[in-house]
Amino acid sequence: MAFQGTSRTLTQQSSAATSDDLQKILFSPEAIKKMATECDLGRHHWMRADNAISVRPLVPEVTHGRIASFFKSGYDVGELCSKGYMSVPQVLCAVTRTVSTDAEGSLRIYLADLGDKELSPIDGQCVSLHNHDLPALVSFQPTYDCPMETVGNRKRCFAVVIERHGYIGYTGTTASVCSNWQARFSSKNNNYTHIAAGKTLVLPFNRLAEQTKPSAVARLLKSQLNNIESSQYLLTNVKINQNARSESEELNVESPPAAIGSSSASRSEAFRPQVVNGL
């Protein structure tokens, strides 16, 4: 399809002509499987001593090649205005520790461009998390769109880099990182405002919180009291022990003695405290 009409029309025609084909490339069963196995999209990545540095591209190599070929073929025949760009609005990483807080170690997480041989953080977007800071949520926002090209033998795209430091004596998994993002592809690139990487420390989930509420405690005590013989908590019609003090005596408030035969004396004689079985 050749370009015709205004710029707005061209954009609409390009999107309509390419959306179905891109959908097939991005959401085929093979592409979905590659996103999970090669990129760890939505999966927990374990940081171990034998995997101290992890570089996870945001697009699988096979999928990258197919998308790049698609845009290149459209560009070569004049149907697309570029060879394609990759944009990622945000990368969100949930980081949790899997060792005790007294373990001395840290994680360094940042977003990189595979076109950079040094794998430097993009615009300084780098976050360091000590073990006792975890759990935490880390957010990255790229400041440019990545061209779909090959640099040397590397497929250029964004990647999440995780470095493990310290943790002497801990050879197993010390932290788990679960990353989520949504990659977008277009023949036009975007302009962005520079935003620093964000870090939000998260309070650990209290599994016993439900048992520490007053209602839960009351129910627990009531169930325990009900398991004991009720005779220990129900008063019979026997005369009350004279050692029991009234509330006025506990407050050291002296009341004048009531005359025998008075209405107040009869009310006092008729009063009997009651104890409810349980709470």
From Swiss-Prot:
Membership in a protein family: Belongs to the cucumovirus movement protein family.
InterPro entries: MPV
Low complexity compositional bias, start-end: 254-268
GO biological process: transport of virus in host, cell to cell
GO cellular component: host cell plasmodesma
Chief localization: host cell
Listed Pfam families: 3A
Name of the molecule in the record: Movement protein
Keyword field: Host cell junction, Transport, Viral movement protein
Positions of the UniProt region annotated as Disordered: 247-279
Domain of life: Viruses
Protein's cellular compartments: Host cell junction, Host plasmodesma
Organism per entry: Cucumber mosaic virus (strain Pepo) (CMV)
Primary role: Transports viral genome to neighboring plant cells directly through plasmosdesmata, without any budding. The movement protein allows efficient cell to cell propagation, by bypassing the host cell wall barrier. Acts by forming a tubular structure at the host plasmodesmata, enlarging it enough to allow free passage of virion capsids.
